[in-house]
Amino acid sequence: MNWEMVIGLEVHIQLSTKSKLFSTSATKYGQHQNTQAAFLDLGLPGTLPVVNKEAIRKAVIFGLAVDAKISKDSFFARKNYFYPDLPKGYQISQSTNPIVQEGRLDIETSKGLKTIRIERAHLEEDAGKSVHGYIAGETGLDYNRAGTPLLEIVTYPDFRSAEEVVAYLKKLHQLVKHLGICDGNMQEGSFRCDVNLSIRPQGQAKFGTRAELKNINSFRFIDKAIEYEYARQVSVLESGGEVVQETRLYDADANETRSMRAKEDAFDYRYFPDPDLLPLVITDEYIESIKKQMPLKPEEREAVYREHLAEQEVEFLLSNLEIADYYDKVAVVIGYKPAYNWVTVDLISTLNRAEKEFSSDVVPAEILLEIIANVQKDIISQANAKKVIAEYIDAPSAIEAIIEKLGLKQVSDEGMIRELVQGIIAANPQQAADFKAGKTKLMSFFVGQAMKASKGKANPKQVNQIVQEELNK
């Protein structure tokens, strides 16, 4: 019998907010256990939730980016279950009428273009974390993550292969990073995926019994987990057994899925509206204001880059999002191609020599633009701009002060440069004669000597012009 794979996905993205969904606790990753947990996060009596406006804004941005409907009225609900890392005994989530509904994302596979329907995306708070092995023989509980804002993105069961799933996840991962709503760090849990997989005989309309796969933190492992689970379910059914509705854990080391617990249905969670939170009302004016500030989608950004840059340059920017964001700020002022050279050749190469990673904070875009402006005004040379960048990296201060400190201000006095050039020509009569005899490549020799004699301070454009004039006399 031929079996068809049917998959729906639930992707949890951690929204990039400074504070939690309903409390003022910080959301920074990797802090010492339980140092970022407010009374509300710990479920202590007498505490009330206050919704994070930035989380709502980011959810709306996502909805607009996937052409979804934004609910004008949505509600927060309590999802009730008991687990050690859920101190309140319930999770604040959204059940009916979530904030984002009926979106779509187009993917490219070996079989061509396919549209994946997004059923919903809803806001919810993350749970805490059980920590094993930190205390010998005990399980500790770290509530730093409890209350962190999540957007759970749920698709319809539109996937028919592992290839389609991976293509969708990569596209979604790229999208949320480009939108600036999630950092996409899978190792830190910022982008997590649950796979709901069932099989059915080819041509049958009715769905089979699904298993939910958890604990998959890389695209490669997702592909392997799906292929293993598909083969397992085929084996179960073809041997006369029944697939059980359950949650299964993927073990990357053993490359297998193992039963974790019975899979609950929605009614098991006894959802009901959270009495401590008012309905979430989103106006048309609010949606329009966000539309005006929407960043470009990855495909839109790529199209702009391809108009101005070479293939390799486009690929570099698209695969280095922080650099691309920085580059865009420079490009809008000085143009796409010059900006690429300044950011990659001048800035990044200088950072590499200083053994520093790229960060937009090391040399802010406005500082680089100030250095570029000094070159454009002939205050410093292009070559000396790197020295200014290097000094700023080492000891940030006013650019004008750095130029003065390093003595890099260009000499643009025509009389002084001409006298310098005349002296160099007089000191090199043979080379001057060879130039006049047709060896025009010697032009660079005289320019180089003039720049060396001026310690790099002479205006290169003027040096070139004056050398040419003097040699052609």
Swiss-Prot record:
SUPFAM superfamilies: GatB/YqeY motif, Glutamine synthetase/guanido kinase
Subunit structure comment from the entry: Heterotrimer of A, B and C subunits.
Pfam families reported for this sequence: GatB_N, GatB_Yqey
Highest taxon in the source lineage: Bacteria
Transmembrane segments: none
Keyword tRNA-binding: no
GO BP term (any one): glutaminyl-tRNAGln biosynthesis via transamidation
Family: Belongs to the GatB/GatE family. GatB subfamily.
Gene that this sequence comes from: gatB
InterPro entries assigned: Asn/Gln-tRNA_amidoTrfase_suB/E (IPR017959), Asn/Gln-tRNA_Trfase_suB/E_cat (IPR006075), Asn/Gln_amidotransferase (IPR018027), Asn/Gln_tRNA_amidoTrase-B-like (IPR003789), GatB (IPR004413), GatB_Yqey_C_2 (IPR023168), Gln-tRNA_amidoTrfase_suB_CS (IPR017958), Gln_synth/guanido_kin_cat_dom (IPR014746)
Keyword Nucleotide-binding: yes
GO MF annotations, alphabetized: asparaginyl-tRNA synthase (glutamine-hydrolyzing) activity; ATP binding; glutaminyl-tRNA synthase (glutamine-hydrolyzing) activity
NCBIfam families on file: gatB, PRK05477.1-2, PRK05477.1-4
Entry keywords, A to Z: ATP-binding, Ligase, Nucleotide-binding, Protein biosynthesis
Recorded catalytic activity of this chain's protein: L-glutamyl-tRNA(Gln) + L-glutamine + ATP + H2O = L-glutaminyl-tRNA(Gln) + L-glutamate + ADP + phosphate + H(+); L-aspartyl-tRNA(Asn) + L-glutamine + ATP + H2O = L-asparaginyl-tRNA(Asn) + L-glutamate + ADP + phosphate + 2 H(+)
Record-linked SMART domains: GatB_Yqey (SM00845)
Enzyme class: ligase
Cross-referenced HAMAP family: GatB
Function description: Allows the formation of correctly charged Asn-tRNA(Asn) or Gln-tRNA(Gln) through the transamidation of misacylated Asp-tRNA(Asn) or Glu-tRNA(Gln) in organisms which lack either or both of asparaginyl-tRNA or glutaminyl-tRNA synthetases. The reaction takes place in the presence of glutamine and ATP through an activated phospho-Asp-tRNA(Asn) or phospho-Glu-tRNA(Gln).
Alphabetical list of PROSITE patterns matching this protein: GATB
E.C. designation(s): 6.3.5.-
Protein name: Aspartyl/glutamyl-tRNA(Asn/Gln) amidotransferase subunit B
